[in-house]
Amino acid sequence: MKVGVFDSGLGGLTVLKSILKVLKNAEIFYIADTAYAPYGEKDSALILKRCEDITNYLLKEYKIDALIVACNTATSAAIKHLRDNFSSLIVIGTEPGIKPAILNTKSSNIGILATPSTLKSDKYQLLVNELSSIKKVNLFEQACPGLAMQIEKGEINTLTTYKMLEEWLIPMKEANVDTIVLGCTHYPLISQTIKKIMGEDITLIQTGDAIAKRLLSLSEEKGHKNIGDLKVTVLHTGLINLDMIENILENKNIEVRKCEI
C-alpha cells in the first residue's frame, strides 16, 4: 500500500508518527510544503490549489492508494474538493477533536487552540453546530497566529513560545478549562509547555491516533494486508529542519529529499 501524507510543514509528522504505530506494510510519502508554510495564515483559494497540486504530484510520481491531509487548515479548505475529484483514493482529513473533548470534560469548559484559518472556516463552525446537541459546554476558542511557525523553527522550549502560550492559556486556566483541543497538527509538539501553564491534570486532545486507526480500517476494507516492511520518504518544497524530523519520528529509518511542486 502506498500512502501520501502532507502538511504545510512538519506538524503533520505527529500524524505520521501515529500511523507508523499501526501500519506495518506500506510505502509512505510525506510532503512538507514548507515553501508555502504556514497554511494557517494563507487564503483558502491558495491552500486549495496547493492541496490539489500535491495530490496530483503524489499520484503521478508514486501512484498512492491513500491520502492523509495532516493539517486542520488544509482539511477545512480542501477535503470535499479532494474527495470529489480523487474518488479512487482513500482520503482522510484532520479536524479538531471537539467530540472527544465534549465527552471528556468534567467542568464543561473546553479550550480550542487553532490557526486563524481553521477557526474562521465554515467546516469548523459546522462541526461545532453538529456537536452542540451532545452536551452543553462552553468553548474558549483561541486563534494562535505565529505559533505553528515557532514550532516549525524548532522553538518549542523557548521563552518566546512560552510567553505566547501563557497569554492565550491563562484566561482558560482562570475559566476552569479542563480539556484543550489541539486544533493544529503542530501543537502536540508543545504539549509539555501547555501542561506547565495549565497543570498536569489538563487533558489534551489530538487526532493523530484516530486518523491512524481510520486509515488501517479503510485499508483493510480495500484488501490491503498489514504485514511486511515500512518505507518512509519525507519530501520538502522549501527549507526544512532536519533535527526536528529526527526528534519527532525518533530517528526512524527515513529518506529525506527536496521536491518541486
From Swiss-Prot:
Substrate binds at D7, S8, Y39, G40, N72, T73, T185, H186. GO terms for biological process: cell wall organization; peptidoglycan biosynthetic process; regulation of cell shape. It catalyses: L-glutamate = D-glutamate. Pathway: Cell wall biogenesis; peptidoglycan biosynthesis. It holds the Pfam family Asp_Glu_race. It is an enzyme of class 5 (isomerase). Keywords: Cell shape, Cell wall biogenesis/degradation, Isomerase, Peptidoglycan synthesis. Provides the (R)-glutamate required for cell wall biosynthesis. NCBIfam families: glut_race. This is Glutamate racemase. The lineage of its organism: Bacteria, Pseudomonadati, Campylobacterota, Epsilonproteobacteria, Campylobacterales. The gene is murI.
